């Protein structure tokens, strides 16, 4: 990416969550969505191939004991998620690599998100910045809330930890993004966000977000 790194925006944390997890953060940056019909650039496909070579079967087995994956596994348990049933994003990526014999390219946005989590252990999500109402934050779901709009919107269990803005739920923590907040391939402004759990260095979070934004910028260049 040319020029300075994008500006990090610190999100808000609900008081109850902040008291329970003082080091919990949600951080985001603005990025550009590649113009359709953008394809994953050669440099990004080559990075995926190199990363796949590093994720052998032995690495996948020991991955959970590395500091950053271990921190996410511990946090999963603290918020009621079983990391052996719902794998942390980096472990899910490692398993996908073993199943397919490599990292499968799924387009510039998904590939940039994949590179971020594989290189740093920190998962990054993307939402349509134009559909947000104010900064992102973390809070528990309220009674009667749903993920998205319309009759098919999923009901949310009260207390489940969410990524939210002033208008309501944006995504389930470490899970699905609301359909009405997902990136639109015809809109250029993306909001990339990462959730930093206790034990994850701030540098890893910044590298994940900046690296993802940089990869997306490359996707608008030569293929």
Q: PLM features: residue spans?
A:
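Charge-biased, low-complexity intrinsically disordered regions
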Residues: 1-223
């Amino acid at each position: 990416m040319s020029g300075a790194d994008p500006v990090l925006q610190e999100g808000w944390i609900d008081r109850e969550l902040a008291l329970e997890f003082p080091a919990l953060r949600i951080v985001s940056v603005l990025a550009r969505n590649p113009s359709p019909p953008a394809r994953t650039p050669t440099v990004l496909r080559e990075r995926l191939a190199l990363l796949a070579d590093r994720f052998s079967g032995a690495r996948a087995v020991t991955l959970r004991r590395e500091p950053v994956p271990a921190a996410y596994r511990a946090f999963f348990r603290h918020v009621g998620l079983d990391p052996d049933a719902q794998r942390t994003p980096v472990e899910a990526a490692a398993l996908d690599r073993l199943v397919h014999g490599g990292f499968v390219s799924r387009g510039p946005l998904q590939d940039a998100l994949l590179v971020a989590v594989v290189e740093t252990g920190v998962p990054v999500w993307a939402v349509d910045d134009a559909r947000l109402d104010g900064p992102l934050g973390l809070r528990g779901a309220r009674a009667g809330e749903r993920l998205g709009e319309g009759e098919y919107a999923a009901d949310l269990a009260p207390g489940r930890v969410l990524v939210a803005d002033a208008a309501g739920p944006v995504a389930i923590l470490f899970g699905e993004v609301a359909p009405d907040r997902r990136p639109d391939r015809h809109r250029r402004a993306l909001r990339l966000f990462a959730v930093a759990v206790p034990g994850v260095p701030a540098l890893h979070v910044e590298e994940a977000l900046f690296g993802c934004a940089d990869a997306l910028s490359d996707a608008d260049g030569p293929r």
